[in-house]
Amino acid sequence: MNTTSSKSKKKQDDQVGTRFLGVRRRPWGRYAAEIRDPTTKERHWLGTFDTAEEAALAYDRAARSMRGTRARTNFVYSDMPPSSSVTSIVSPDDPPPPPPPPAPPSNDPVDYMMMFNQYSSTDSPMLQPHCDQVDSYMFGGSQSSNSYCYSNDSSNELPPLPSDLSNSCYSQPQWTWTGDDYSSEYVHSPMFSRMPPVSDSFPQGFNYFGS
């Protein structure tokens, strides 16, 4: 039993020494780290540590101090070749990569006019005007065609006209032929006064535009 225990303990010590450079396990369970100076071939004692990783890190610090980027280390360092370490574990001493720089603020002014033009373009059904043709009669009896436009936006709808005004202002005059003269029967608007009677001295009737 004692022989078997000694062999397994020695095998464990060999595995620790093989895994990490410059690390040896002490009989009482702690780990010692030492390094050999490449110039003088002397061994330098680095201390005793509770874990093998701490002892391996002490070795790496001493090796990098002596040999620089040509050192053989236990852990991976970003400033050294990947093949220089005996493990793939990243060293705790290796600083994390810097965070990406923040995005530069945008200095472009907001084009409110462009936004308004896009919103008020003819593609918008809320802002498309509708035009209708309205036939109206002038007092001289000549017919003219007028157009007006309105928007279909319900929020801008005008209130209805009063009944007396709507029945009188937009009524068309009724013309009656009586022979040699013109006579008219029409409904007057409250906003306009009655037209003066036509004098017999004007043989051409209603000729407002001159001869």
Swiss-Prot record:
Pfam family, one: AP2
Compositionally biased spans, kind Low complexity: 81-92
Source organism: Arabidopsis thaliana
Swiss-Prot/TrEMBL induction comment: By imbibition.
GO annotation terms (biological process): ethylene-activated signaling pathway; gibberellic acid mediated signaling pathway; positive regulation of seed germination; response to gibberellin
InterPro entries: AP2/ERF_dom, AP2/ERF_dom_sf, DNA-bd_dom_sf
Annotated segments matching region Disordered: 1-21, 74-110
GO cellular component: nucleus
Family label: Belongs to the AP2/ERF transcription factor family. ERF subfamily.
Tissues/organs with expression: Expressed in germinating seeds. Present in young shoots, at low levels, especially in leaf primordia and developing leaf blades. Also detected in vascular tissue, mostly in xylem, of young leaves, petioles and hypocotyls.
Keywords tagged on the record: Activator, DNA-binding, Ethylene signaling pathway, Gibberellin signaling pathway, Nucleus, Transcription, Transcription regulation
The entry's DNA-binding region: 19-76
Chief location: nucleus
Superkingdom of source: Eukaryota
Keyword Secreted recorded: no
Subcellular localization(s) per the UniProt record: Nucleus
Name of this chain's protein: Ethylene-responsive transcription factor LEP
Residue spans of biased composition, Pro residues class: 93-107
